[in-house]
Amino acid sequence: MTDLYRFLPEEMEKLVIDMGYPRYRADQILLPLYYKFPKNISDIKQLPKTLIAELIESGYTIGSAKETHRIVSEDGDTTKLLLNLTNNESVETVLMQYDPSKIGGHPRSTICVSTQIGCAMGCTFCATGQMGFETNLKAEHIISQVIHFEEIIEQRKEHITNLVFMGMGEPMANYDEMIRAVKILTDPRGFGLGQRHITISTIGIKAGIERLAEENLQIGLAISLHAPNNELRKKLVPTATSDSVEEIIEAGHNYFKKTGRRVTFEYALMDGINDSREIANELAELLRGNGSHVNLIPINPTAGDFKRPSKSRVFEFKRILSEAGVNCTIRIEKGTEISAACGQLRTDTIG
């Protein structure tokens, strides 16, 4: 069975032409896929019955995620879903909605998608990392997470405005499927989301960052750094062996030079581990003057022993970076109480 959500628009054109139908039939498939959310090929009423029958007989299908659990934060701004995918795997996906009265600008509806079940990176402070790696998700499974939430919020006359690859898994370790999903989701004949509204997060796989820089895309890049030196980073990210902190930062800077997109370095602050003044100064020295941005994330509760620093310690860390000329913010917290925040996703339970 081949999911129609897997096809790039040009591939959909080739499919219908190879089946003996005119090119425009591709758009008659693509438009309802991304705006009407059909569950079966037979639901696409614009298509001739002969094409519908041939697609079904040839093993094509429309794969839609099935929601098995839902939990919503107390303020109603964050929704976490456990979705059953067409490969019978379950994955967590999160919707975060931002009120402009709180953040300024326009309202935002951001989807946090997963690219893997579990993760092989083994970050000691991350619930997903402690699951271990199970499997990569196909592009259509990534897309189905987006489609499922779009269908939900469209009922409220809202639409997805932003997409972050910050859910379960390391996107760069599933590069081909991840980038296929990105290209489909940003194609005007696909989901049509603007490239600048997408951010890909990585633990710092240099080869993946370099490859992404060559894609000629305006995708945002977030690098999970968490430490200013290799000794500490190795303790927090056991798989961080081949690429040094300096090499990762250089790869991020090269991405900025290639794409013009400012790189964000994510830094999870852990009490007594990586939050001292000395470490803040070391980080400032590394990042000063390279045009990057640091997003400080007070560690979210997981099953591990790591604790969140005091607010005064967090603000002191930020002050040191800012006074050194490093652009820095503290992440707006979303979904912590429903285990939907950074580092909290896993599939064994949902609230």
Q: Each PLM stretch: what is its role?
A:
Residues 150-329:
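Conserved AdoMet/S-adenosylmethionine-binding subsite of the radical SAM
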Residues 95-96, 177:
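Residue-level structural signal for beta-strand termini and adjacent loop
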Residues 1-91, 97, 253-262, 267-351:
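Auxiliary Fe-S-binding modules of radical SAM enzymes
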Residues 97-144:
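Canonical Radical SAM [4Fe-4S] cluster-binding loop centered on the CxxxCxxC motif
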Residues 79, 91, 108-113, 121, ...:
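Generic beta-strand structural signal
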